[in-house]
Regions:
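Sec-dependent N-terminal signal peptides
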Residues: 4-13
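Beta-propeller-forming repeat regions
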Residues: 19-389
């Protein structure tokens, strides 16, 4: 698993071979975080630059993009001690078109408590003050036990909802019992007021993550990853419902993201099982294991970092594997079927026990960079894309 990301990937384009070269350089912007449960990106203060947001153990923070390399990313705390337990997830997106993100967070992280709503799970919308560098006002929303993941999703009519996924159903023991209920909130005009919501019965267990399926920025549905596999839920005229379709069946899945092979061909990347050992790609009727050398794989993204017209896969794991490694790797595909991939290290000098990662163009050069948070390493690292440097 040790190869520098000085990528010289041969691509077959119209029968000709062309070389694609890129590299990443890691920069630690914070080496004193507690856990780094979840990352998000977006313009927090309306200055036109993409900032970084982090759900840490007891604080919700954002890092102001300085707009130039090697300048410090100023850290601002916008919420702290929301519950007695840890924070666990964060969602940030500009849902009202004012050029600044709205932020929701999940807290009350207590995965072993599935019966007592007062001791497990919490969802908050954070109301920003005029000065977004100060503390934001938390608005407590409905919650289920073991809240774990959330995302803002855009409906076909252009309005947004907040989708929130627990890890367990109420009363579960060892991943057995009632199925998980996904919460889908409507956004009220008065965000300090009452948030209406629907509960989507997934009939799934240990639902660790989900992937919104958006086409041209409009939501078609979500794919939910859990103990039983990956199930698709659709968002139609009558609301949310199961499609009775399984993208992955009878295999435990912890992380899921979708990507493009180009020419209107899609693939799905997963980490299997939950906190698992394997990175897997599904394309058409193919299932390809890219590596089985992970230990507690916990972060996944698909995007085109190199302008190839197809997506690459970035993944991270948080515990030392058989040869003592933790880190972040990128996989570059080279065939139209999605069966052939090459693995590369982003930057060997940047050590990270990866809890979460997310792509974003932080320097405005048109290429996606990668932000990762490290659990045992207590750091936030930006991997700067050097394709055009």
């Amino acid at each position: 698993m040790k190869r520098h990301l000085l990528i010289l990937t041969a691509l077959l384009i119209a029968g000709k071979t062309s070389a694609q070269t890129a590299t990443f350089i890691g920069e630690s912007i914070d080496d004193k975080i507690s856990i780094g449960y979840g990352l998000a990106t977006g313009d927090v203060d309306g200055d036109g630059k993409t900032d970084i947001l982090l759900a840490d153990k007891k604080e919700i923070v954002w890092y102001k993009n300085p707009g130039k390399k090697e300048a410090s990313w100023t850290r601002y705390v916008i919420a702290k001690d929301l519950t007695e337990q840890d924070n666990v997830c964060i969602a940030a997106r500009d849902i009202d078109g004012d050029g600044k993100v709205e932020v929701a967070v999940g807290a009350g992280w207590n995965p072993s408590e599935t019966k007592n709503l007062k001791q497990s799970g919490a969802v908050f919308y954070l109301v920003p003050p005029q000065d977004r560098m100060q503390l934001w006002e938390p608005v407590k929303l409905h919650h289920e036990v073991t809240i774990h993941r959330m995302q803002w999703v855009k409906r076909a009519d252009g309005t947004f909802q907040l989708a929130v996924l627990p890890l367990h159903g109420e009363g579960n023991v060892g991943g057995e019992g009632a199925g998980v209920k996904m919460i889908v909130f409507d956004v009220p005009e008065d965000k300090k007021g009452i948030w209406g919501y629907d509960l989507l019965e997934t009939n799934m267990h240990m639902t660790h993550n989900f992937q919104p399926m958006e086409v041209s920025g409009k939501l078609l549905g979500v794919s939910v990853a859990g103990k039983e596999g990956v199930q698709v839920f659709m968002n139609g005229a009558d609301g949310w419902a199961t499609s009775n379709q399984w993208m992955v069946a009878d295999k435990g899945v912890g992380e899921i993201r979708s990507g493009s092979l180009g020419k209107n061909q899609l693939f799905t990347a997963t980490i299997e099982p939950m906190h698992g050992t394997s990175l897997v790609v599904y394309s058409k009727d193919n299932r390809t294991v890219l590596t089985d050398k992970l230990k507690e794989g916990h972060a996944l993204a698909c995007a085109d970092f190199f302008g190839q017209g197809r997506d690459q896969i970035v993944m991270g794991w948080r515990n030392p594997n058989a040869i003592g490694e933790t880190g972040v790797r990128i996989f570059v595909g080279s065939d139209p079927e999605g069966k052939k991939w090459q693995e590369y290290v982003l930057d060997e000098k940047s050590k990270i026990a990866c809890e979460d990662l997310i792509p974003a163009d932080l320097d405005g050069d048109g290429d996606l960079d990668i932000i990762a948070s490290g659990r045992a390493t207590h750091n936030v690292v930006v991997y700067w894309n050097q394709r055009k440097k």
